[in-house]
């Protein structure tokens, strides 16, 4: 018995030592964070902001089912005036109503990269401290719809290339800039451009779009901001759900099994049951691996030993918040619920966001079981899609991290899964490396202003974005 207890103690101590060893090993991988140099003077920051403000003043709101070119034409004129070198040197193509594709030829014309940021915005609603399209500077920030999402990255891409061209720069490979006019409504801009790329056998070594940024740390206890790079985007899958009634006139029966009642029960059960597969996907593990060396020791211990604590984490993450839950499995939202006057049928749409297509197939089986229970017919909508992920260790991801470290030495780069949507998803079929990261730095208020009131961005963030893209293009090999 004594030998057994001693053996048990040895096993337990060995287990603890392994946990501590892995945590210490992770701590040793932490890069020393250093103070950032001011890349631009205050006067230069203000000058960039004034130029960007001309773009912000263009009210390029995209709307479902209609297109008015007035404000979009105004923006095109602004771009031509602001960036004459690009418009003189680049080949420009337009797809759909106003999706721009610019191409600057490189030394090696067989290779291509593309920088992206859409130029449409959502409508200004709610109460703002300053007019929604004022494009004016207050408290060292530029205010207006699009300053964060995403005219600042678009401006920075153009300004960086404009500056480089004025210096006689010739890129190592072809450099494209893509900007759609209807990203916010899931429009046809980039999909139309994709047809052209495929017809001409154009592929991209790297796609760099919006979707990530420099934000407050997502893990408690980390004292530096984090450059979150989305290397995967959740898929989109819509199910039309139908409940029908064959019982005759509802007023002549006491039937409680109505289409509305059955649909309500179906939706309730799908929403309340833990139906879907939960996993710690490689992209999420990569996020923890990159962030945990900078966290307090107990957090490092947890995240550096996912072999031990992974099951616990994938159970806890959905309980932390919706965004954390979205990274470990499929989410399902019901909308467009309607019935006819006689309540002879009820229709609802189930909008699913899977991480991987393989998991979606299993998740759909769970929904189908519940649908059968309530006699609900399920019909998949058209244009359902899942997207290819980017290898966290790919050359493009490593290069992007390198540029972040060099321009923002006080920031921690990390990959993650994007639960929202970008234009970049359309190019997954013609690129092995699709990265969703814009080098804008936001505090919590600025992050919360996306698609909300009081959207604004700091002047130094605008300038640093230009510096980042210039560095990225100049050193791309």
Identify the meaning behind each predicted range.
Residues 12-147, 167-171:
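Acidic/His- and Gly-rich active-site-bordering loop/insert found
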Residues 92-93, 108, 215-216, 276-344, ...:
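An extended, acidic, His-containing surface patch that forms the Zn2+-binding/catalytic region
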Residues 119-120, 270-275, 368-376:
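A common structural junction motif
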Residues 142, 148-228:
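Acidic/histidine-rich catalytic neighborhood of metal-dependent amide-processing enzymes
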Residues 191, 199-361:
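Midchain, well-structured core segments that form catalytic/ion-binding scaffolds
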